[in-house]
Amino acid sequence: MRFKGLDLNLLVALDALMTERNLTAAARSINLSQPAMSAAVGRLRTYFNDDLFTMVGRELVPTPRAERLAPSVREALLHIQVSIISWDPFCPAQSDRCFRVILSDYAALVFFEKVVTRVAREAPAVSFELLPIADNYDEYLRRGDADFLIFPELLMSRAHPKVALFEETLVCVGCHSNKLLSEQLTLERYMSMGHVVVKFGNARTASFEEWCLLGHGLKRHVEVVVQGFSMVPFMLSGTERIATMPLRLVKQLEKTIPLRIADLPLPLPAFTQALQWPALHNSGQASLWMRDVLCQEASRMPSPHEVMRRLRIS
């Protein structure tokens, strides 16, 4: 099938090549033989009058022309998928849809487990693939490789629709035996102590509290960097290190790991965990249903003030 001289099947091949960056893997992903994919590459090069890819080792490296084509090709294919292929009404009780969600271990532990429990009741065949916060999470949404992102709203791109889920606040924590961490922690002591910090992905994307501290012109003495909040307490154990962590997660972890908790010595703002999704999914029935579930579960969460009150009592 040709449209204005272009075999539209070639766009599927081009998208697979851009995704896999390997001829064999790209062919496998769209159920083509390797010779057929090689032929498709030749036809693409002829049509666009460009090499499109060069081989570097075992990897196909796209040319600038291929890089410019890729977003439009992916958007066109996503639009076909959303508006034509996936047109059937979504029935949660009967669907076997898998939702791919990018989120931190913090969001998974304090929030998403409630979502999974509810969905297991209402849509038992629906499943989830939880993806870690990566350097290119915005690209995952744009390409349709993820259905949702849960992340601090201030750190989100403006390229996709979003909605607020719940507010969170930060506290300072240390090992239960850390005598240097007092409830009346001074800024001077906070800055001088060794810190455990969380950074996401290979680019070491800053967490919300680091982003705020840098805004105040403050740089901590970092002794350990980890890629998830759930690792932090183990890096504090038996040391005089401290960390800045979301209150809800501290409350949850404190059930099994003894922690000493103190208010931060500077007024870092509460932050909003938000939900973001690809613009092309905005009116999709599956996406709408899942967004409803996520927002309803978020609305049931206690406020940071109530969480702190319960923590002080316990």
Curated annotation (Swiss-Prot):
Origin superkingdom: Bacteria
Pfam families in the record: HTH_1, LysR_substrate
> Is Transcription one of the keywords?
yes
Q: A single GO molecular function, which one?
A: DNA binding
Q: Which UniProt keywords apply?
A: Activator, DNA-binding, Nodulation, Plasmid, Repressor, Transcription, Transcription regulation
Q: Which residues form the HTH lysR-type domain?
A: 6-63
The entry's DNA-binding region: 23-42
- The SS bond pairs are none
Any idea what job this protein has? NodD regulates the expression of the nodABCFE genes which encode other nodulation proteins. NodD is also a negative regulator of its own expression. Binds flavonoids as inducers.
Family (UniProt) = Belongs to the LysR transcriptional regulatory family.
Query: Can you name this protein?
Result: Nodulation protein D 1
According to its UniProt entry, this protein's organism is Rhizobium leguminosarum bv. phaseoli
